[in-house]
């Protein structure tokens, strides 16, 4: 996780020609980390070649940690001078990091886009820079990363999250077209339609939704990105479902939940 930022800092001082002792030390750290990474990639390659169970364990770990590890590079109080003073932006770090991570997972023999739905729910055709911009927007809004109890919502943030949700759907878990509708007290309604192996997300009210979930934006973010148990949210009436009980019961298979977090929920789910 630290390697992308380290790369940019090292590059800055190398170009500036300042702090030669620091640069020499960073170069040694980089070589050491490359050995660690190479060892890890080799171990995973051998484990994945021998066992599908190891692949499943790796996928489950990624499902749990990725929404939080994205926040590692967020500067204190979102003061971007922590990066811009070194000549780069957060989006540069995230774009570089995604390219690097994708290459390393490909080298393990288990590329990220071969993992189950929801592990790496990004459009592979979208440029890394654009993906990075979307991630930073979700982090700024409090949808990903450190919980703030009051995740912000606007049309762009809502659209990005529901694109991720649609890409997270396991289309093999349904036997007919199905539509899920979200009605928010404090945001625009959204729906996800799964039909013939494809998924799409749209703003507004869908015709003949199979399941409708009424909730608030903050409560849904707790479930969608932070691993809060949707069943508990329903019992507490923070999420109020209506429609087909059969499709409602299938939702955990269609949208595999993230492992429950040990922390206390924020907002009204406390």
Cite the ranges covered by each PLM segment:
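Feature captures hydrophobic
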Residues: 105-270
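Non-heme di-metal
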Residues: 1-148
């Amino acid at each position: 996780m630290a390697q992308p930022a380290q790369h940019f800092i090292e590059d800055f001082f190398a170009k500036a020609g300042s702090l030669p002792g620091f640069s020499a030390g960073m170069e040694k750290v980089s070589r050491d980390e490359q050995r660690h990474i190479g060892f890890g990639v080799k171990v995973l390659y051998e484990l994945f070649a021998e066992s599908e169970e190891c692949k499943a364990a790796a996928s489950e770990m990624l499902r749990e940690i990725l929404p939080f590890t994205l926040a590692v590079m967020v500067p204190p109080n979102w003061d971007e001078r922590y990066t811009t003073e070194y000549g780069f932006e957060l989006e540069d770090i995230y774009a570089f990091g995604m390219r690097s991570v994708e290459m390393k997972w490909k080298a393990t023999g288990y590329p990220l886009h071969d993992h189950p739905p929801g592990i790496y729910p990004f459009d592979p055709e979208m440029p890394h820079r654009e993906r990075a911009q979307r991630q930073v927007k979700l982090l700024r809004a409090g949808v990903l990363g450190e919980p703030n109890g009051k995740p912000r919502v606007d049309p762009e943030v809502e659209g990005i999250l529901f694109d991720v949700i649609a890409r997270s759907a396991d289309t093999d878990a349904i036997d007919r077209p199905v539509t899920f509708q979200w009605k928010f007290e404090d945001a625009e309604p959204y729906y996800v339609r799964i039909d013939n192996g494809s998924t799409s997300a749209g703003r507004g009210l869908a015709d003949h939704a199979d399941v409708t979930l009424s909730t608030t934006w903050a409560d849904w973010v707790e479930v969608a990105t932070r691993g809060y148990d949707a069943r508990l949210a329903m019992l507490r009436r923070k999420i109020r479902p209506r429609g087909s009980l059969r499709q409602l019961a299938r939702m955990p298979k269609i949208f595999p939940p993230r492992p429950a977090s040990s922390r206390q929920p924020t907002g009204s789910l406390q």
